[in-house]
Amino acid sequence: MRALLLSGCLALVLLTQQAAAQTLLVVGDSISAALGLDTSQGWVALLQKRLADEGYDYRVVNASISGDTSAGGLARLPALLAEEKPALVVIELGGNDGLRGMAPAQLQQNLASMAQKARAEGAKVLLLGIQLPPNYGPRYIEAFSRVYGAVAAQEKTALVPFFLEGVGGVQGMMQADGIHPALAAQPRLLENVWPTLKPLL
């Protein structure tokens, strides 16, 4: 009888621990979807391992889709929030907006709306900033790069100013297409995010 009681208590503790796990939702594009790599090799998978190794009870949901834009992320977000109920939302979008020459003002509006929707559901928000290559022209690049800081200030979200710091344009860090981070870059991407993400946990 005592053994059964102890077994029941242990099961209750385990169930309670499982129920306590919070969700971290990543909404991104091909960079976070680890295009060209196995998803288990991407920075988001490395983040899940880092959280476990450091004792953070989080379940990471990677809702990143290759080719996605800020408009696509905004359209998908309400259903993701309802289904996953995240405590923290990481937004990594805008690169495809820039590559398509979309208006920075529209990008800013979309990202701000995503942050507002996430915060309305009680989630903290971390925005990962993207910069464009120099061939897009200084005026467009400057307007684009200002978007992320403006959204972070307006919506009071955490910000990584340049997610691809030490990766973009660096020899050996990019795949052959020159756009997507290589396997060697994935740990660096995690390190770019971690110092800003950790205080939000």
From Swiss-Prot:
The highest taxon in the source lineage is Bacteria
A GO cellular component annotation here is:
extracellular region
A Pfam entry, by short name: Lipase_GDSL_2
Q: Give the GO molecular function terms.
A: arylesterase activity; carboxylesterase activity; lysophospholipase activity
Q: What is its EC number?
A: 3.1.1.1
Q: What class of enzyme is it?
A: hydrolase
Gene3D superfamilies per record: SGNH hydrolase
Which reactions fall under this protein's catalytic activity? a carboxylic ester + H2O = an alcohol + a carboxylate + H(+)
Localization of this protein: Secreted
Enumerate the CDD domains for this protein: Lysophospholipase_L1_like
Active site feature: S30 (nucleophile), D177, H180
List UniProt keywords, sorted A-Z.
Answer: Hydrolase, Secreted, Serine esterase, Signal
Segment forming the signal sequence: 1-21
Please explain the role this protein plays, according to its UniProt record: Esterase that exhibits the highest activity towards Tween detergents and p-nitrophenyl esters of short acyl chain length. Also displays a low thioesterase activity towards palmitoyl-coenzyme A, but is not active towards acetyl-coenzyme A.
Family membership, please give it. Answer: Belongs to the 'GDSL' lipolytic enzyme family.
Q: What protein does this entry describe? A: Esterase TesA
- Give the originating organism: Pseudomonas aeruginosa (strain ATCC 15692 / DSM 22644 / CIP 104116 / JCM 14847 / LMG 12228 / 1C / PRS 101 / PAO1)
